[in-house]
A protein has these predicted regions:
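Acidic, metal-coordinating catalytic segment for phosphate/diphosphate chemistry
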Residues: 13-51
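Short, well-ordered beta-strand micro-motif
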Residues: 54, 132-134, 152
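Conserved Nudix-box catalytic region and its N-terminal flanking loop in Nudix hydrolases
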Residues: 58-96, 100
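Polybasic/polar functional segments that serve as interface/processing modules
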Residues: 77-78, 84, 111, 168-171
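Active-site segment of metal-dependent pyrophosphate-handling enzymes
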Residues: 99-139
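NUDIX/MutT-family hydrolases
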Residues: 130, 141-171
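Charged phosphate-binding loop/patch that engages nucleotide di/tri-phosphates or the phosphate backbone
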Residues: 169-182
Length: 182
């Protein structure tokens, strides 16, 4: 867990919302070692998740997936397995959901953190560490049809115009942070 705490501590924050989410995450990490999901859908609550936002470096376009369970357009990602390092989880989820070698992680750690109540009857809190991966949008993907209805490349303009209802609620803030760091 100390590796997770270091990742959270070292993450620069974008705004007051991310600062609040980081403070909650630190308090949570200080209060328990039980941070990995052990049973579906929500044990323990909260639990650790990774997102991987895939970006085409040539165009800046972002790949999102129409997630079957959440009903939202989301980045690739998923739950961190017990004892797994979040960066290892991000790389694993990327391969499982988009097919190897769909994309490669950029940098050596997460870029963003969110504390988000999920939607639906089994609502719980996902503490999400957001990573970035690079991919060429012209290359075909072998995405997981069991998990997603579809995958789609979105231009930044289209996302900023639409990234509210039907999308991961913090996506536009993540993109603002990413744009500020590049």
């Amino acid at each position: 867990m100390s590796a997770v705490r270091r990742l959270v501590d070292d993450l620069p924050v974008l705004d007051g919302i991310e600062a609040e989410h980081r403070d909650r995450a630190i308090a949570w990490l200080n209060s328990t070692a039980d941070i990995f999901r052990r049973a579906k859908p929500a044990t323990p609550d909260p639990h650790l998740v990774t997102y991987v936002v895939v970006v085409d470096p040539a165009t800046g376009d972002v790949l999102l997936a129409d997630h079957r369970l959440s009903g939202l357009w989301l980045p690739a990602g998923g739950h961190v397995d017990p004892g797994e390092h979040p960066t290892t989880s991000a790389a694993r989820e990327l391969g499982e959901e988009l097919g190897p070698p769909a994309a490669s992680l950029v940098g050596d750690g997460p870029r963003f953190l969110t504390w988000t109540p999920t939607r639906g009857p089994d609502s719980h809190v996902d503490v999400s560490l957001w990573y970035v991966a690079a991919a060429d949008r012209s290359r075909p993907l072998e995405w997981d049809r069991r998990e997603f209805h579809a995958v789609r490349w979105w231009s930044r303009t289209a996302l900023l115009d639409r990234a509210t209802e039907g999308f991961e609620p913090h996506l536009s803030r993540f993109l603002a942070k990413l744009d500020g760091s590049t």
